[in-house]
Amino acid sequence: NERVRKMKIVETKFYGQLIVVSDYILLGILWVIVCLPVITIVPATCAVFYVMAQWKGEGSGNIIYFFFQGIKQHFGKNLFLSLLTIIIYFLVNQLLEEQTIVLSISGYVVLLIYSMFLLSWIYVISENKDITFLQIFEQSAWKVFFDFLRNILCCVLLLGFVLLIFLFPPFIFIFAGGVWKLVSIILTIGNER
């Protein structure tokens, strides 16, 4: 009788949802660990989107396998973009330290547009397995303009997440997977194939 009761707990919807939530928390923790060398931010983020794409329709699971498959996919292109991201953010940070309002505003605009391009890049890579660098760049650039409101919403969500992390750093481990899931949902609305 005790064994039957335990089986019923395991088979409940609540338990199933708990497994999914824990998988997203584990995915977020894995993302944070792989992002520790800053140069791997873009490959790690693309891997998160790859994992979520693999989970569509199948449920969650196989986190580590899918994650490293996602990192391996387009690794060179993503590493190049990570390096470019570090350089651009460093230069924009230097620009924001200037005392003139025009340069500060220019810095924020560049930062916003590049962040939107980065989100579009990650989305395009997660949706297309065999694609050239030029095609990724072209599709990402178009998405910055055609999916402008979605990209802005994702940037605001990520900014809120960063501010939350500054308030209490352990939140990054708890909420990273969920934030990337929300970003994925926002970017895929209306783009389902």
Q: How would you describe each model-predicted region?
A:
Residues 1-193:
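Helix-coil boundary and N-terminal low-complexity module in membrane systems
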